[in-house]
Amino acid sequence: MIGLIEGRVCHLSAPVACLMTASGVGYEVELPLPDFCQLQLEAMASLWTHLHVREDAQLLYGFLHPTERDVFRQLIRVNGVGAKMALAMMSTFSATELKHCIDTENDAALTRVPGIGKKTAQRLLIELKGKFDHIQSDMSLLTEVEQQIGIAANSEGVILAEVESALISLGYRDKEAQQAIKAARETDAGQQLVDTQSLLKLTLKQLSNF
């Protein structure tokens, strides 16, 4: 089992990062979008990983904090929740926000995640009750020192396409992704668009308000 990968971030294509280890092996890892946005091209990174084996592929999912990985593993144990849906949940909510949704039985909030309807949300509330009690409400799930994000894409069109592609890969509909991107770009910060990660962060905030 591959539990932790440390290496240089040699490629970023939301929501997948490729880390080149000291042994010369490059690992492709899919991350929740908030974690992806913390990575910097050519910088060193450490990711806690979960290996997901399918008949046709072996996929690595990565997280900046081991508690996030624990949350992911709890999510995929729920009947009807696969790795893609779990990743979409962790791209929509932080671990502490997910805990709050479960503790307060807020199924309406959970239905904001692509692919989660009323029945699935209620199943999540039942099967996850008490599973996140080890998560403290004031806990930070990011690394101790967050890296500055400053990765310039080739053009504005490339940035927009990458952000939309990342959202669609998580299950958001084309129109929903485009509306969120449009709303993000209309903010003061969005008008100073410089890179894919920054726009992803803004767009995720907009989606949480929809």
Curated annotation (Swiss-Prot):
* Keyword terms: Cytoplasm, DNA damage, DNA recombination, DNA repair, DNA-binding
Instruction: Note down the stretches annotated as region Domain II.
Output: 65-143
Which InterPro entries does the UniProt record give? DNA_helicase_Holl-junc_RuvA_I (IPR013849), Hlx-hairpin-Hlx_DNA-bd_motif (IPR003583), NA-bd_OB-fold (IPR012340), RuvA (IPR000085), RuvA_2-like (IPR010994), RuvA_C (IPR011114), RuvA_C_sf (IPR036267)
Q: Where is this region: Domain III?
A: 155-210
Residue ranges of the region described as Domain I? 1-64
Q: Which Gene3D superfamilies match?
A: 5' to 3' exonuclease, C-terminal subdomain, DNA helicase RuvA subunit, C-terminal domain, Nucleic acid-binding proteins
Give the region (Flexible linker) as residue ranges: 144-154
**One BP term from GO:** DNA recombination
What Gene Ontology terms describe where this protein resides (cellular component)?
Answer: cytoplasm; Holliday junction helicase complex; Holliday junction resolvase complex
Question: Coiled-coil intervals in this record?
Answer: none
Q: Which Pfam families match?
A: HHH_5, RuvA_C, RuvA_N
Indicate yes or no for the key word Phosphoprotein. no
Q: Which GO terms describe its molecular function?
A: ATP binding; four-way junction DNA binding; four-way junction helicase activity
Cell compartments where the protein resides: Cytoplasm
What assembly does the database describe for this protein? Homotetramer. Forms an RuvA(8)-RuvB(12)-Holliday junction (HJ) complex. HJ DNA is sandwiched between 2 RuvA tetramers; dsDNA enters through RuvA and exits via RuvB. An RuvB hexamer assembles on each DNA strand where it exits the tetramer. Each RuvB hexamer is contacted by two RuvA subunits (via domain III) on 2 adjacent RuvB subunits; this complex drives branch migration. In the full resolvosome a probable DNA-RuvA(4)-RuvB(12)-RuvC(2) complex forms which resolves the HJ.
Summarizing the function annotation, the protein's role is: The RuvA-RuvB-RuvC complex processes Holliday junction (HJ) DNA during genetic recombination and DNA repair, while the RuvA-RuvB complex plays an important role in the rescue of blocked DNA replication forks via replication fork reversal (RFR). RuvA specifically binds to HJ cruciform DNA, conferring on it an open structure. The RuvB hexamer acts as an ATP-dependent pump, pulling dsDNA into and through the RuvAB complex. HJ branch migration allows RuvC to scan DNA until it finds its consensus sequence, where it cleaves and resolves the cruciform DNA.
Q: What is known of its domains?
A: Has three domains with a flexible linker between the domains II and III and assumes an 'L' shape. Domain III is highly mobile and contacts RuvB.
UniProt lists the family membership as follows: Belongs to the RuvA family.
Q: What is this protein called?
A: Holliday junction branch migration complex subunit RuvA
